[in-house]
Amino acid sequence: MSSVSKNARAYRQRKVGIKTVMPIYFERDIPDFDEEASLQRTVPLVESGVEKEEEEEKHLQQVINEAHEAIVRGSEKKLIIPTREAKNIGIIDKYYKKNFILPKTLIRFSLTVEECTNPEYCMDEHDTEYFLKLKQAQPSLSKFSELDFEIVMQTFEEEINQNQPFLSMDTSQILPLSELITSFELKDVLYLKPLASQVYPYWRERRISKGGLPIMAKAQVGDDKDDDDPYVCFRRREIRQARKTRRSDAQSYDRLRRLRQSMETSLQLLEQVYKREQKKLQALEDDYAIFQKRCLVKKLKRTLNIKDSDELLINPKRRPIEVKPAAPVPTPAPPVKTSPHPASYRPQPTRNVEVRPLLMLDDVQSAQITQFQIRLQQRLTKKEQLDRNWVDLLETPSTVIHTNYPDSFYRNIIPYYSGKETKQSHNQLSIPSSTPSTPLSDNGPTYSTPHSSLSNFNTCDSLSFSSNNSLYGYSTLLHPRNPICVRQRIGRGGRLMLDRTRALPVHRLSKPKSRVEDRWLFDIPFDADDTIILDDESDASIMFRASLLNDDMGTQS
């Protein structure tokens, strides 16, 4: 065997394309093939232009070899590939126009002409028999053709599939003719209404006999994995691997889906707004008409001197409409179906889910605050009961201190000394009293305003110093003694008795009040928001600098 044949056998056969490199053979390079050997070989020496799987077909090999021998030896072709003859059927002008107009979009689809013009429903022998009987029984329906019958059946099928997709679960709930007849108006086939009213009982009977499923079986379009399925007539010529969905494709699809949803929502909103505005306009027109009628009624009443109530001239208050629950419509019992479960099987009853009212956040927070206040009040009441027989002397006692009645008669005596008096008068006591009382001596102590022996913290205000006071000097006591509390009472036999006790220490300022106020006189708290931002290029700043320059020039001169 020559080297050409060896290379041809080693070459893997592929599909011939535009960019395929084809070798050129001269007549002297082509070997003389034996017919029997060429029929027995499985792979041709020259590219045949067909797929590799089909090259082994017997009849195809015969046709290829016959054509090759006709080229090489000049003999006539005896075997040809059978093809149908082309002839004019006379209906091309019906579907294809001579004056072709370029469409606005380049969207193409794979539907045939019949699929575009004719309905998907196809009549079977039962439909043909019924349609012939119907035409014979009612001659007025003889004008309708089989195509019209298919359109009616297709319309019924589409409407029931759209409105009742789960009809197979309960066939007794099939829609009546009054609800299906409206679809003929939308599809612009009103001329088929007489035929539809006669065909509806037949279609309803066939649909129920099918168990609620479509009357016409659909073509099963699935994967070609089940090659042994006898019901699949046409299989794909070659199996291609399904393209894997990439992430970018999924994102693009998701964006387009959301865009379409938003556009549909916008369209629905616009339609609802248009309907609302129409209703508002109609309401305004009705109100205006009512107003004109009322004006006419008022004029007639005045003319005829009719004294009646003005109920017709005032709009009555609208009461809220109470929606009454509609009475359940009795439905016929569905046909009894044989259950696949045994006789002992009992379905579980459905659970009644209790619907609870929706709680608001404000209500929950107010309830929590109320519960907290109740718990706090209970704790305070409990603590008050525990501290009932005790006295709390802290600054912020939890319980109120009740002063005993005898202790309320004590009076404070606050002595002070003056530098202008003699040394003997230093030992004498004098009290500024806000209320008149009987003195014990001429310069002796007097009774001041009532104070409790347990609450002497307010005496700090009466002991405040002032730099303007003439008594302020070196002889003044900066740290006065604790005031003496005295109480006058009458004992047995009319004796006058004076009880004396020391009060609690008085908390005083370490420095006079005036000095404390002077310390904070010029103190200004700093705040970042109070910062004043100066603009050097403002008119005020420029005028200020100009005035400084004039002053400097004046001083130099």
From Swiss-Prot:
Which InterPro entries does the UniProt entry name for this protein? Enhancer_polycomb (IPR024943), Enhancer_polycomb-like_N (IPR019542)
tRNA-binding found in the keyword field: no
Subcellular localization is given as: Nucleus
Q: Where is the composition biased (Pro residues)?
A: 327-337
Report which superkingdom the organism of origin falls in. Answer: Eukaryota
* PANTHER family on file: ENHANCER OF POLYCOMB
| Entry protein name | Enhancer of polycomb-like protein 1
